[in-house]
């Protein structure tokens, strides 16, 4: 609750491992708030949140992330002045917050992993380009690749196609399906574009006001 305003009430949902599940609902219905609660950003007042059978509702964000539960955002969280490879390396769960330490001695296999994932999302040719110079759609793909660097078991995607050129949407749909099928990652997707969610999701939950 926020100052007496209850954001998510009487919600019960189960996301089956290995599936793509959609989450829809009108603006203000609490979809993003639910995501923030699942990953530990917002504490819950009561109820339970379990991941792989483990109660996670009282765990901090970094601990939940290390368990393999990650999310992306409506507005991308990238480092605009760093190039794509550097963004990938700094997002890795084993990275120190000190940039000099991260980039002074990088294991070859980590760089190769970053390059392979950038190739997977179609950004290999732009790997040395500053992230701030990418289009918004390309930044979304970079953020997806950054999440994949940490090998999540489950990924929460908050409107992955919002603000993207319609001609690029099919490519993003295809890549998300490949993330699920090739990497075995469970996806929970907030999306307002019903065409997208119908193509992606096997099951869909709807939040009402």
Question: Model regions: which residues?
Answer:
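Conserved ABC ATPase "signature" region
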Residues: 101-126, 174-177
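Conserved ABC transporter NBD signature motif
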Residues: 47-54, 67
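Catalytic Walker B motif of ABC-type/P-loop ATPase nucleotide-binding domains
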Residues: 155-159
């Amino acid at each position: 609750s926020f100052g007496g305003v209850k954001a998510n009430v009487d919600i019960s949902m189960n996301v089956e491992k290995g599936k793509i599940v959609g989450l829809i609902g009108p603006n203000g219905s609490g979809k993003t708030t639910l995501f923030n609660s699942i990953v530990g950003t917002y504490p819950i007042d009561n109820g339970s949140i379990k991941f792989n059978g483990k109660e996670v509702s009282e765990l901090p964000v970094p601990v939940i992330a290390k368990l393999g539960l990650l999310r992306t955002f409506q507005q991308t969280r990238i480092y605009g002045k760093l190039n794509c490879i550097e963004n990938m390396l700094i997002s890795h769960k084993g990275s120190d917050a000190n940039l000099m330490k991260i980039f002074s001695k990088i294991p070859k296999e980590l760089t190769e992993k970053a390059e392979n994932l950038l190739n997977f999302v179609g950004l290999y040719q732009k790997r040395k380009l500053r992230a701030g110079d990418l289009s918004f759609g390309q930044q979304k793909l970079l953020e997806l690749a950054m999440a994949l660097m940490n090998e999540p078991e489950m990924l929460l995607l908050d409107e992955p196609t919002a603000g993207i050129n319609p001609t690029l949407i099919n490519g993003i749909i295809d890549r998300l399906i490949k993330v699920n099928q090739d990497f075995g990652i469970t996806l929970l997707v907030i999306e307002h574009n019903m065409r997208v969610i119908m193509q992606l999701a096997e099951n869909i939950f709807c939040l009402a006001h």
